[in-house]
A protein has these predicted regions:
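Non-catalytic C-terminal accessory modules of carbohydrate-active enzymes
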Residues: 1-115
Length: 115
């Protein structure tokens, strides 16, 4: 189970309502969301919460996992995105300062800004 409000649950809490934290992590913390149907176009726009210095994870797409890592250190923010080789994903990374960086034909992108 994922909820601590009921530590002595008499039944399984492995249900759809327990999957919201995974969605929130992928969408808000990592910042990945489709901008066209079928995940053919993806935007990666992390919303780094206060107190969190880095996050990384993989977001499943129909073309394979999209790897995302961001780090905040000494006023700098660095975002790395990797898509599966040969995947027809159009990826745009949007940094916290608003700069949009398209991935292009490479399978990896690293971009930085000052916070």
């Amino acid at each position: 189970t994922t909820w601590c409000e009921n530590p002595d649950s008499p039944r399984s809490e492995c249900h759809g309502w327990s999957s919201a934290p995974i969605y929130e992590f992928s969408r808000m913390v990592l910042g990945a969301f489709p901008t066209r149907d079928g995940w053919s176009h993806v935007s990666v726009q992390p919303c780094p919460p206060e107190g969190l210095s880095f996050a990384e994870g993989s977001v499943p797409t129909p073309y394979g996992d999209l790897f995302i890592r961001w780090e905040r250190r000494d006023g700098d923010f660095t975002l790395t995105v990797r898509k599966p080789e040969g995947a027809p994903l159009c990826v745009t990374a949007v940094l916290p300062d608003g700069l949009a960086v398209p991935m292009g034909s490479d399978c990896s992108l690293t971009a930085s800004c000052t916070l």
